Amino acid sequence: MSKPRVLYISQHLTPYLPETTMSHVSRMLPQGTHEKGKEIRVFMPRFGKINERRHQLHEVIRLSGMNLNVNDTDHPLIIKVASIPSARIQVYFIDNDTYFKRKAVLEDADGNFFPDNDERSLFFVRGVLETVRKLGWAPDIIHCSGWMTSMVPLYLKHVFADEPYFDKAKIVYHAYDEGFEGALDAGMAAKAEAHGIPADALSSIAEPTFDNLNALGMKGADAVIVGSENLTPEGQAVLAGLDKPILPYSGSEGFVAEINAFYDEMLEGKTEAVAE
C-alpha cells in the first residue's frame, strides 16, 4: 500500500520567518507527519525578508518559467527550494520579482499593508497548484494554513476541476486568528473570476476582509482544524454553523499526533467520530 501524501500550503513557516503559532505548527507538523510514514510536500511564499543565503535557497529551473496572469498581467513563476537539515524536509518557495522581491512580508516599513496583497495571495495559490501538477505528485490531503491559502478550495473546485492529480484530495483548512485590519483590494473577486471561478462563488469576498477570507477557506474545505485558542467572533460563528469534520484547538503540544489521527480518520472516511 502506498504512503498517504500530504501537501502543506502555508503562509508562514519558521525558521524562514519570525515564529508565531502558525509558523511554528507549519514547521513542526510536516516533520512529524513525515516521521509518521507519510509523504509530504511543503510550500510557502518566498517573501523578500527571507535571507536566501543564510537558508541556502536555490532555484529549481525545471519547475520555473511558467507565466501566471494576474490582473491582466503575466508574471513569471519562480520556484526555489531549501532544506531544513534538522528535519530532513524540503520547502518549496513560490517567488516572483513583482510580488515577493521587496524586503518585507505583508507590510511596509511604516506598518502599512501592501495594496497588492490580494494579488500576491492569488499568485501564491495558483503557483503552488501549478507546481504540484508539474511535479506529477497527487496529494491525498491538502493542508492549508493562513488566510493567504483561503482561495485554495475554490481554485481546486473550479480552475483545477479536471486535474487528475487533485481529484481525490481532501482539503483541510487550518484556521488561525493571525489576520489583518481592514480589507484587501476590492477587485480581488474580479481578479479570481478572470481565472475561471464563478462570480457567485466569490460573492462573500466582495469585501475581502480577514474574516470573510477565513470564512471562505473554512466553508470550502472538507474539514477544519482550529489553530488558535480564540478565533474572532465572526470566525467562531462560521465554525459553529459548519456541518463537516472539525478538530478543535488542542494547545501547543501534541498537535502532531492529533492532526495525523485526524488525517487518518479522513482518509478512512471516519472523521465524524473525531469531529466533536
Tell where the protein language model's regions lie, with residue ranges.
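Catalytic cores of nucleotide-sugar-dependent glycosyltransferases that transfer UDP/GDP/TDP-activated
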Residues: 1-276
